[in-house]
Amino acid sequence: MSSDRMMEYYYSMGQDCLTNGALDDAVTYFRKAANMGADEAAYEICAIGRQMETGDGVEKNEEKAESCYKIGVEYGIEKASLYLGEMYLRGIHGGKPNPRKARRALEDASDMGNREAAALLGKAYDEGLLGKVNPKQAFRYYLLAAERGDTSSMLMIGLFYAQGTSVAKDLTAAEMWIRKGREEGDADGDQTLRVFLSVASSEYITGAAGKVDPAKAWQMAEEAEALGDKDVFYRLGKTYSAASNQKDHLPKAFECYKRAAENGIPAAMAALGLCYEAGLGIEEDIARAVSLYKRS
């Protein structure tokens, strides 16, 4: 029998065993087929490993799943390296995690272009799952994953730029990445953008953004408010009040408190009352101050 016929025979036998639920025998036949050049047989072994790992329609067996993934790795299946890395990171069958093996497997998958592996490496370095927290490596792998289309990593890269963590603070780059992740449908996109805009709006007042831009600050606060942050103008008002040495800051603080008070924020009403009582950014008006204090 020719080698091609033998390969087809082994692959067919593997499929029959798979259909009959004889997974161990299926792996044996698929491996023989893979050894003879049937690439799809190696993928079948990896898929069987996934079934065994998750218990999808079969008895859960992480040890056998690990064995299947190792076979997949031999044939260069990137998902096999990813799944191995995930298993080693959490620990097999209730055992302790193995950071060294996890890193090696995930790096192999990432080197083959797997974005999930790159994202997981970013998370692992970010949270110290591989030992110590390593922000530079976290940023490196989050960026790889983001460039490959991982939306969660896009948000994380944005936050790294926003905070200046292991990379120069750059609110323009931060905003670009966060908006990109949101536009591409990440479930946390709205919340991440809302928080970013809220914090950045104050930084454009204090200069922590790298420059002072009151118009940008107001625009960001308006968008954060539209996304559900009803307190944002109150906090922006406090930022202006804290920097009241600037002649135009008290009137701007007043406008911010007024905007927040219109949203029903009690603390903003009290702050607005103080502005009227002390004539801070507005002409003194004790009657209005008392009214606002009562409402707060």
What are these regions (language model features)?
Residues V133-F139, L143, R148-Q163, A168, ...:
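Ankyrin-repeat and related helical/solenoid repeat scaffolds used for protein-protein interactions
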Residues Y11-C17, E44-T54, S81-R90, L120-E127, ...:
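Hydrophobic face of amphipathic alpha-helices that form TPR/SEL1-like repeat modules
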Residues E63-H93, R100-D108, L120-K123, E127:
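A generic tandem-repeat structural signature
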Residues L155-M156, E175-E183, A187-E203, Q219, ...:
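Core solenoid repeat modules with strong leucine/isoleucine-rich periodicity
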Residues R5, M36-E40, I45, T54-D56, ...:
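Short helix-capping/linker turns of helical repeat alpha-solenoids
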Residues A33, I71-G72, D108-A109, L144-A145, ...:
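Canonical positions in the second alpha-helix
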Residues M1-G21:
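N-terminal leader/linker segments that initiate helical-solenoid repeat arrays
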Residues G21-Y29, E59-C68, G95-A105, K132-Y141, ...:
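Structural signature of tandem alpha-helical TPR/SEL1-like repeats
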